[in-house]
Amino acid sequence: MLRFRLILASLLCLCLSGATAAATDIKTTPLYARIKASLDAVPAIDTHDHLRPFAEIPNQDDTDRGRGVTLHSIFAGSYFGGIHRLSPWPAGKSFDEWWKVGSHDFDNARATSSYRYLLPAFRDLYGVDFDTITAEQARDLNDRIFANYKDDKWLNDVVTRRANIELMFIDSYWARLQFARAYQYSVPLLNVTEIMSGTHRSHFSDSDSPYLYAEQRGMKIENLDDYLAVVEKLFVDAVAADAVCLKSTQAYQRTLRYEDVPKPLAQVAFGKPANKLTPEELKDFQDFMFWQVLKLSAKYELPFQIHTGHGRLQGSSPMMLVDAIQANPKTKFILFHGGFPWIGETGAIAMRHRNVWIDSVWLPTLSYTMGKRAYQEWLEVMPADRLMWGADTVQAEGIYAATEFTRQCLAEALAEKVERGELREDHALRIGRQILRDNALKLFPKLKRQLWRKDVPAVTSAQ
């Protein structure tokens, strides 16, 4: 009996010890602090953003003091409005007019990642705890934001110094066929989303039109072969402009299941405006063009960033791309957003196919908990050199917030694995640097000649 009691007491102590350890927030430990400090010191390469030239920063409000960026603008340019109601700014009115209604927009959002990811920006950039903000503090915060956007100094300082970003891929969906660089840290890419739907010139605006692009270069588009020649010329020009990859967001409009459609079926659709196309004809054309783009992606060594998951859930599972991935081993596929919510499936795809990379862009801001779980699961099933990240937003505060949230999420995921004995600390530091910077340099070798920072620290190791 005594022996039984001793064994029972020992088991109880072990259970209590385990419960205490499990209840400890890893972010309060010295281990987490070391890993987070190491990740903070990495000049990151942000593989996806939508930062416009400064004069075109979106979501500005017409206030009683003129047009500018407001506290409302920060939330309007974030993911908050995709999940929660965001009261519009009353045109020409004061901050107080908006705040007396808008302050209640956050009541049911406090636990959501789409709200919480912005808190580090208010805390670190402005010294404000938004969870406990008063009307007076909110008014002052709004005034400071408005003043900061009088010129581009604040924006550039936040991106390069506070967020510690060295290079940023900018998906200029508002001018897809231009490769201008508005900032020292800009990296161009070629967005092929609309090209894959271009059965007729009426499909395009002037800023996106391959038909206008062809005319400006003395090329004609009279049939599908002409169109394909112009598309390939676009790839040639993109490479010459140092574009580093391709991007598609067609999953917002249609399924990711692309069949290898023969050319004659695509020719049926070509030349028809949208109002003359059947849904089947449009899909056939898009499917055909997708496979053409896959071939050009391999030929011109432009890895292909593909939106998967959240946005339009129907048909957006990355599993629908597996046949195309398997049939095009020389094309480098980058599955955006980790396929949220299908993070396990995305990891399995990367595990089985060496031509697949995963970009965690957007994931922590959709669900911090799922983001942390994804990092841990992916690192268990695939090599660490095929994971990346991106901020995916439109102004300084959003960029800082998404960057800080990602560094925190990644540091927490790595620290937990170290604490459980699943990873050495020095290996965790290396993996963190790979995800934030080195993996992009490896996948996109052109980036090396675009680096401009002189103060990049060497790889840190645990002592």
Language-model region placement:
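Mid-to-C-terminal alpha-helical segments outside catalytic/metal-binding sites
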Residues: 25-45, 54, 61, 69-125, ...
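Histidine-centered catalytic micro-motifs
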Residues: 43-56, 304-309
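Alpha-helical scaffold segments that flank or form the walls of functional sites
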Residues: 40, 61-183, 209, 224-242
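Divalent metal-coordination and catalytic microenvironments
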Residues: 48, 168, 246, 307, ...
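Boundary at the C-terminal end of the N-terminal hydrophobic targeting segment
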Residues: 18-23
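Active-site beta-loop-alpha junctions enriched in small/polar residues
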Residues: 50, 173, 191-197, 249-253, ...
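Histidine/acidic residue-rich metal-binding segments in metalloenzymes
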Residues: 153-159, 222-248, 255-356, 370-388, ...
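Bacterial N-terminal signal peptides
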Residues: 7-17
